[in-house]
Amino acid sequence: VTPQVLDILDEYGWKATFFCVGDNVRKYPEVYQEVLRRGHRVGNHSFNHIRGYRYSVEDYVANVQKASTYIESCLFRPPHGRITFSQIKALKADYDIVMWDVITFDYDKKKKPKQIMRTVRNYLRKGSIVVFHDSIKAKENVLTVLPQALAYWKEKGYSYGLL
């Protein structure tokens, strides 16, 4: 899915920050390199996309550090937005922890493209961080909605900024 997302972003002249799962980068290093080659930024999204609250601080940090052997970035986004204060404290010396304010739920098979686009239109504000997913679960929705969202943002005069 990532190569198709990259093509859509290129078509509209936009850059994005991709928060990568370390195990995916390990399995598909050529896709990771292509993201960088096309001028996008990357962030760490853990090695196994784990839910923070289910892990000790030590195990969580170890998982993030394992991902950092494949992903060179000072940015970290906790999977599912789940992270404890103790985990934040342990990671903040090495990472800027980046959350979001607009989640598209593009991975939810029950969500239709129209609903996702409505979310994008209704909740976008100046400075918003919008989350799309370049995953198999999100494929149908992201490939439909991302071009619509980019066209809408251009029409409304929004611009992007890499994190």
Ranges and model annotations:
Residues 33, 57-64, 112-117, 143-147:
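Charged helix-capping and loop-helix junction motifs
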Residues 10, 36, 91-92, 154:
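Anion (oxyanion) recognition and catalysis
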Residues 7-16, 24-27, 140-163:
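C-terminal domain-boundary segment and adjacent tail
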Residues 1-53, 59-66, 72-73:
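Active-site beta->alpha N-cap acidic-glycine motif
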Residues 42-48, 81, 131-134:
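Histidine-centered catalytic micro-motifs
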Residues 74, 82-123, 157-163:
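His/Asp/Glu-enriched short active-site or ligand-binding loop at hydrolase and phosphoryl-transfer sites
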Residues 15-17, 39-43, 75-77, 96-97, ...:
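Structural preference for beta-strand elements that scaffold enzyme active sites
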Residues 19-28, 50-58, 77-84, 105-111, ...:
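Acidic-and-aromatic substrate-binding clefts and catalytic sites of carbohydrate-active enzymes
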